[in-house]
UniProtKB/Swiss-Prot annotation:
Species: Homo sapiens
Keyword flag DNA repair: no
EC number(s) given by UniProt: 2.4.1.134
Signal peptide as annotated in the record: none
This protein's name: Beta-1,3-galactosyltransferase 6
Glycan-linked positions: N131
């Protein structure tokens, strides 16, 4: 009799254990059946909202601007940025550092942003010349993270750009010539500045700057911008942003294209109807060029050359690259 009771107790315990094991298995299968995004798999929480869609354009335009340069930005909006082609052709922002600004300056920028929505505000950056290299790198890194684009034009807020001509030239390129593009007006014989505003005390590479496209305006392909963002923590920043960019891209397999139609030196060479970008423009210059384009389909009311230009000789040493001659725009 005792043996029967023991056998019964063992059978009951075994049955209860089997039921518990089956229940656990069913619970596990039910949890696995819920999709990762299903609220049942998230302890009753609602699923996270979808990530916002990235802006997209063929050509991005980043204009480095100062907090108090609202009038310049207004003129650019109404002149060369107004000629941006079809939807999806051009995406543009004015980049402004806001660290250290007073309350009134911040409010003015907030009002401008509310009205136009085209400011790229950089709260971690104090807008000053000595921070220009960090600013340009921050602009490019932000662009790579937030916008789908093929090319970017970096310009200053005293530059005038022919977006229609730039778009046409870039679209006409063969696929192989759209990769690793660094396009502008190059210098290879720039002597290292020992003093003044452009002093580069930390430059130790050689007695000349490495070949670089002058900063009044240049074009980069998206793959180079992506490379710069991924490398940003390892890049040495010098005072001049264009000199820094030339050094950063020096060891990279890029297509450096010197183009005299980029009038982007520290002083304008004049006015040519061939120019794609013209630096050192007053507000009156911009308004006149825009009006002449609208009225006559050409950039200049009257073509004039104030300084000679050059074609970069890539076969010569950098110090002998750039001989100015007649007949070059």
């Amino acid at each position: 009799m005792k043996l029967l009771r023991r056998a019964w107790r063992r059978r009951a315990a075994l049955g209860l254990g089997t039921l518990a094991l089956c229940g656990a298995a069913l619970l596990y299968l039910a949890r696995c059946a819920a999709e990762p995004g299903d609220p049942r798999a998230m302890s009753g929480r609602s699923p996270p909202p979808p990530a916002p869609a990235r802006a997209a354009a063929f050509l991005a335009v980043l204009v480095a601007s100062a907090p108090r340069a609202a009038e310049r930005r207004s003129v650019i909006r109404s002149t060369w940025l107004a000629r941006r082609g079809a939807p999806g052709d051009v995406w543009a922002r004015f980049a402004v550092g806001t660290a250290g600004l007073g309350a009134e300056e911040r409010r003015a920028l907030e009002r401008e942003q509310a009205r136009h929505g085209d400011l790229l505000l950089l709260p971690a950056l104090r807008d000053a010349y000595e921070n220009l290299t960090a600013k340009v790198l921050a602009m490019l890194a932000w662009l790579d993270e937030h916008v789908a684009f093929e090319f970017v034009l970096k310009a200053d807020d005293d530059s005038f750009a022919r977006l229609d001509a730039l778009l046409a030239e870039l679209r006409a390129r063969e696929p192989a010539r759209r990769r690793r593009l660094y396009w502008g007006f190059f210098s290879g014989r720039g002597r290292v500045k020992p003093g003044g505003r452009w002093r580069e005390a930390a430059w130790q590479l050689c007695d000349y700057y490495l070949p670089y496209a002058l900063g009044g305006g240049y074009v980069l392909s998206a793959d180079l911008v992506h490379y710069l963002r991924l490398s940003r923590d390892y890049l040495r920043a010098w005072h001049s942003e264009d000199v820094s960019l030339g050094a950063w891209l020096a060891p990279v397999d890029v297509q450096r294209e010197h183009d005299p139609r980029f009038d982007t030196e520290y002083r304008s060479r004049g006015c040519s109807n061939q120019y794609l970008v013209t630096h050192k423009q007053s507000l009156e210059d911009m308004l006149e060029k825009h009006a002449t384009l609208a009225r006559e389909g050409r950039l200049c009311k009257r073509e004039v050359q104030l300084r000679l230009s050059y074609v970069y000789d890539w076969s010569a040493p950098p110090s002998q690259c750039c001989q100015r001659r007649e007949g070059i725009p």
